[in-house]
Amino acid sequence: MTPLLLLAVLCLGTALATPKFDQTFNAQWHQWKSTHRRLYGTNEEEWRRAVWEKNMRMIQLHNGEYSNGKHGFTMEMNAFGDMTNEEFRQIVNGYRHQKHKKGRLFQEPLMLQIPKTVDWREKGCVTPVKNQGQCGSCWAFSASGCLEGQMFLKTGKLISLSEQNLVDCSHDQGNQGCNGGLMDFAFQYIKENGGLDSEESYPYEAKDGSCKYRAEYAVANDTGFVDIPQQEKALMKAVATVGPISVAMDASHPSLQFYSSGIYYEPNCSSKDLDHGVLVVGYGYEGTDSNKDKYWLVKNSWGKEWGMDGYIKIAKDRNNHCGLATAASYPIVN
């Protein structure tokens, strides 16, 4: 092959390999990069643009179907826009479902009229939405949020607790920092350690580090934890009578990655394969019929820009959708 012919073949191969972008997305792409402060090298830019466009088309298709009544929730482009679903799951979903020491079993209250709606934010026992960043520490945010609520109900003081303390210091109990963990392991660490520091004294860094716990800055403690039976009815009673509850869920789907508003129902969502720790802060229903369109009100740890200001409504009483009732628990605060 002559050099000129070889050069022509190479140029043709390069041209064929270059992604063909939809030019109508140019303004949105540049705005998205500016908003989320993305800087890429040339080769990575092409790849990330291709991923972003694929996600954008999926979102547009879903929202078109929503307008036609096919779905009960909307989707929108967000900070996860240049990630494939595989990358997204690896980076932010850090719940590690495994056998572990069980806590006390939740004793459901008898002869109690359970309210049809609950929102613990209205009682002042939920801190602002936080952001775990690119660290699989969802379990730490779920655990800290649950303990924040229990401490508030005991003391009347709402103090933001240190997720970094849990990330750095609970390895002996079985947690793996940014590589995942369990809320119950976190509660066990707090019990054995004798306390948990405040977020102010031990700020979040979104990466693994050495343990820097200082007892003089501890502002919360627990004496163990309670596991809730794997039924939505039991979870409902716990949320109504105990406070915000730590739960795990299947968060592996693109529909959740780009969730925006409405009641989330994903036909492929598993009630057993759980990969993300979150916090149930209430429940309710949309419309006028309390027996329809019911949802769990869930606080996430992906920042306020995701979902409904950091929250999501997940379908309730639909066969334990996404597994919220499968691994629910809360710390014991005396």
Curated annotation (Swiss-Prot):
It is found in: Lysosome; Apical cell membrane; Cytoplasmic vesicle, Secretory vesicle, Chromaffin granule; Secreted, Extracellular space. Its main location: other. One of its GO terms (molecular function) is aminopeptidase activity. Disulfide bonds join C135-C178, C169-C211, C269-C322. Keywords: Cell membrane, Cytoplasmic vesicle, Disulfide bond, Hydrolase, Lysosome, Membrane, Metal-binding, Protease, Secreted, Signal, Thiol protease, Zinc, Zymogen. SMART domains: Inhibitor_I29 (SM00848), Pept_C1 (SM00645). Zn(2+) 1 binds at E122. It is a peripheral membrane protein. One of its GO terms (cellular component) is secretory granule. Residues 18-113, 289-290 form a propeptide. The keyword Cell membrane applies. It is an enzyme of class 3 (hydrolase). GO terms for biological process: adaptive immune response; antigen processing and presentation of peptide antigen; autophagic cell death; CD4-positive, alpha-beta T cell lineage commitment; cellular response to starvation; cellular response to thyroid hormone stimulus; collagen catabolic process; decidualization. The active site is at C138, H276, N300. Zn(2+) 5 binds at D250, H253. Inhibited by the propeptide produced by autocleavage. Long isoform of CD74/Ii chain stabilizes the conformation of mature CTSL by binding to its active site and serving as a chaperone to help maintain a pool of mature enzyme in endocytic compartments and extracellular space of APCs. IFNG enhances the conversion into the CTSL mature and active form. Inhibited by CST6. Inhibited by the glycopeptide antibiotic teicoplanin. Inhibited by amantadine. Zn(2+) 7 binds at D275. It catalyses: Specificity close to that of papain. As compared to cathepsin B, cathepsin L exhibits higher activity toward protein substrates, but has little activity on Z-Arg-Arg-NHMec, and no peptidyl-dipeptidase activity. During export along the endocytic pathway, pro-CTSL undergoes several proteolytic cleavages to generate the CTSL single-chain and two-chain mature forms, composed of a heavy chain linked to a light chain by disulfide bonds. Autocleavage; produces the single-chain CTSL after cleavage of the propeptide. The cleavage can be intermolecular. Zn(2+) 3 binds at D184, D227. Belongs to the peptidase C1 family. Thiol protease important for the overall degradation of proteins in lysosomes. Plays a critical for normal cellular functions such as general protein turnover, antigen processing and bone remodeling. Involved in the solubilization of cross-linked TG/thyroglobulin and in the subsequent release of thyroid hormone thyroxine (T4) by limited proteolysis of TG/thyroglobulin in the thyroid follicle lumen. In neuroendocrine chromaffin cells secretory vesicles, catalyzes the prohormone proenkephalin processing to the active enkephalin peptide neurotransmitter. Dimer of a heavy and a light chain linked by disulfide bonds. Interacts with Long isoform of CD74/Ii chain; the interaction stabilizes the conformation of mature CTSL. This is Procathepsin L.
